[in-house]
């Protein structure tokens, strides 16, 4: 048995789904208000001054803080069933199925939020390591539980959950600099669906 590690946004999907999820789950008045508050940070992000993880943390805080956890989970379930399938690359699903037919362990390793990605992975019988939202007394706190699962954190999470040295071949699939450490773990690396050395 080998192991295949897949990034989600931009690798399995055609686009980043963080913002579409917030637009789907967050009430429109709060979304507009949050957009105004985040406008300077968005500009900084586009100029390369504000890191993506800082941008995501601020958007989570403004969009999801105080939301009922059960309601948020239901929104995540609906998003996974109604929106994600429209963004999934056919060849990505084919590759996942190819690995499963080989008897490989298939793990999605993503900075995407557990609140929706867990539903999609469960639906496709895939293991998951991803960014998790913190809750307290049935409400989302607007913070991540632990570090966002990007960059070096992807490698750390994989090593904490799996003995990668026990697998004859480790495959990894990614599409951005946030996947570099994930790709470095693998014998067979695919960046933007092209095999790289």
Where does each model-flagged region fall?
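Metal-dependent phosphoesterase signature
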Residues: 55-91
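Generic structural signal for well-ordered secondary structure
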Residues: 14-15, 33, 52-56, 65
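Conserved alpha/beta cores of soluble small-molecule-handling proteins
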Residues: 2, 29-31, 48-51, 69-71, ...
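C-terminal cap/substrate-recognition subdomain and adjoining C-terminal extension
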Residues: 1, 74, 81-197
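Short, compositionally biased "basic patch" segments
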Residues: 43-45, 54-69, 124, 128-133
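Active-site neighborhood of HAD-like aspartate-dependent phosphohydrolases
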Residues: 1-48
């Amino acid at each position: 048995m080998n192991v295949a590690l897949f990034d989600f946004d931009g690798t399995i999907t055609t686009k980043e789904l963080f913002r579409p999820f917030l637009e789907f789950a967050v009430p429109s008045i709060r979304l507009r208000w949050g957009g105004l508050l985040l406008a300077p940070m968005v500009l900084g992000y586009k100029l390369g001054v504000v890191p993506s993880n800082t941008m995501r943390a601020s958007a989570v805080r403004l969009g999801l803080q105080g939301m009922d956890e059960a309601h948020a989970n239901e929104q995540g379930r609906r998003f996974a069933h109604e929106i994600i399938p429209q963004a999934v690359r056919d060849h990505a699903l084919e590759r996942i199925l190819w690995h499963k037919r080989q008897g490989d362990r298939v793990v999605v390793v993503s900075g995407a939020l557990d609140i929706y990605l867990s539903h999609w992975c469960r639906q496709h019988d895939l293991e998951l390591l991803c960014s998790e939202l913190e809750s307290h007394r049935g409400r989302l706190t607007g913070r991540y539980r632990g570090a966002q699962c990007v960059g070096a954190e992807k490698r750390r999470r994989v090593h904490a959950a799996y003995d990668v040295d026990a697998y004859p071949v480790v495959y990894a699939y990614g599409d951005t600099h946030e996947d570099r450490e994930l790709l470095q773990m693998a014998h067979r690396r695919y960046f933007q669906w092209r095999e790289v050395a």
